[in-house]
Amino acid sequence: MNLCSSGATASTTSLSSTGQAERSGGGGVAGGGGISNGGGGGGGVTGSGGGGGGNTSDGLSEATHCFGGSGGGATASGPEETINAISPANGGGASGAQQPSGSNGQLHNENNAIMPPETRPKMVTVKHPESNKPKPTTKKSKPIQADQDVIKALQRCRDEGIKRLDLSKSSITVIPSTVKDCVQITELYLYSNKIGQLPPEIGCLVNLRNLALNENSLTSLPESLQNCNQLKVLDLRHNKLAEIPPVIYRLRSLTTLYLRFNRITAVADDLRQLVNLTMLSLRENKIRELGSAIGALVNLTTLDVSHNHLEHLPEDIGNCVNLSALDLQHNELLDIPDSIGNLKSLVRLGMRYNRLTSVPATLKNCKCMDEFNVEGNGITQLPDGMLASLSGLTTITLSRNQFTSYPTGGPAQFTNVYSINLEHNRIDKIPYGIFSRAKGLTKLNMKENMLTALPLDIGTWVNMVELNLATNALQKLPDDIMNLQNLEILILSNNMLKKIPNTIGNLRRLRILDLEENRIETLPHEIGLLHELQRLILQTNQITMLPRSIGHLGNLTHLSVSENNLQFLPEEIGSLESLENLYINQNPGLEKLPFELALCQNLKYLNIDKCPLSTIPPEIQAGGPSLVLQWLKMHSPYRQM
């Protein structure tokens, strides 16, 4: 999309498909103006002089598209140009020189005499930084005139009575005043442009219902916009507004207002006038206080004030009884008002990453909530029985707080829950029977707590699919783990486990088993029964050998046994046809690799750093893992297979 003010003759801005703009100076390229920051008069292309010179800048290549100066110049086009500029000694431009004549192709003067070399015109090639190959002027593309195109689009809109006009993503900087003629428009899309301000004539669009101005550079709005008294949706996301423009408060027909990602620091009391709002987004601004006016917006169903600097919410928030989604995450909230309990239609309440130390007991009235998330606060306990009252909850996230025990309320609080996240707290035990009613529980995250043992009824968690117990102080894995036959992901890294029970082999659906950084010395033979296993992580343990049954793990793609005490790898490792990544680095006792490793046809990465492989020549090891694999293949008895 191209822009140009009506009647312009001395300057044209064109936007190419690459997004570069070419603008004219006062004179031609060869005559009146220079391309490379030229000034003065009578200069050539290189910018040693030239009146009204053009200039280049990062991301914006400028060149003339009009004639001027002492002698008109050749025009340039595209991000790379070859400009044949003729610059006689008298300072004349390209148009002042004669073209070559005669069959021999030599240049002649006005008397048809051959011109001596010292007086011949110079051929100058200009290459822009973006190009390695100059482009002849004769192949220049026709400039696109952005301004003219906008004017034409508005004319067509007026003449054909178009009601929906989309000028988005067109690099527009100015909306012409002729927009006033398109009074029939109901939808106007100007998003993703470079508009710094709107013309007052925008107020003539009295039938406008949807106005999308997001992703521009607006710092204000014209007062005339108040005449658009049928406007329902106004999108101002990603602009440069330092305040909510006062005219917005007079657009009382608004139902949806997006102000996300601006520079707004305050919300005026006049907000109370927008009583028809159902959706208000003030996300990602710099707002420190949300006044009582918010309570007047009784029709709100969605309010997003996340990613601001709020420390408190007004009690009046409780008047917004139709709210179904309230997003408060990533603020600096110290408390939540008791009036939050009035929001009985609330389904989603985002309170993540604030400075809360508690939540009000009145939240138990919000029985429509299906998710409870207070991650990243300083909460030590929840009100008694609150979670049990919220019987519709399916997801509970209490991670990164200061909990020392499970919330009070017993098994009833997890009846319909399928996901519980208590990561990064200070909980030292999981109460016996706490999940006895949680028949749908499939995901439990207890990472980074202080667990020393697992409850005796762990065998009843039969529907568990993902269990994360990493970074605790577990010393033993109960035999009853065998009952978790739906388990697909088991993460036990960074604990104090010395062995894995034989019953691990019953977890036939297991895809990921992470035992990194424990004290394990041996693995049970039954590990080979985990036929669905794709990732086995054993690094940083005390393992001296892998069981031969590991060769039965036909779906294994990732095996990490680095930082152990391996003396050898079993020959059966060659049966791992799906293996792609093998880490055996930092095993100080590993002196040789089995030739069978060469049978792993899909192996893409092999790490053997700090392994004293005495049977493989040093120059082969120095060549890297790929060369090692080639050597194994060449010396393998299976090389003909």
UniProtKB/Swiss-Prot annotation:
Biased composition (Gly residues): 24-56
Electron transport recorded as keyword: no
Biased segments, Low complexity type: 1-19, 96-106
Xref: PROSITE patterns: LRR
Record keywords: Leucine-rich repeat, Repeat
Disordered as annotated region, ranges: 1-146
InterPro entries given in the database record: Leu-rich_rpt, Leu-rich_rpt_typical-subtyp, LRR_dom_sf, LRR_domain-containing, LRR_R13L4/SHOC2-like
GO cellular component terms, A-Z: cytoplasm
Keyword rRNA-binding part of the UniProt annotation: no
LRR repeats: 161-182, 184-205, 207-228, 230-251, 253-274, 276-297, 299-320, 322-343, 345-367, 368-389, 392-413, 416-437, 440-461, 463-484, 486-507, 509-530, 532-553, 555-576, 578-600, 602-623
Pfam family, one: LRR_14
Record Gene3D superfamilies: Ribonuclease Inhibitor
Family to which this protein belongs: Belongs to the SHOC2 family.
Main function: Acts as a Ras effector and participates in MAPK pathway activation. Probably acts as a regulatory subunit of protein phosphatase that specifically dephosphorylates Raf kinase and stimulate Raf activity at specialized signaling complexes upon Ras activation.
Name by which UniProt lists this protein: Leucine-rich repeat protein soc-2 homolog
Organism: Drosophila ananassae
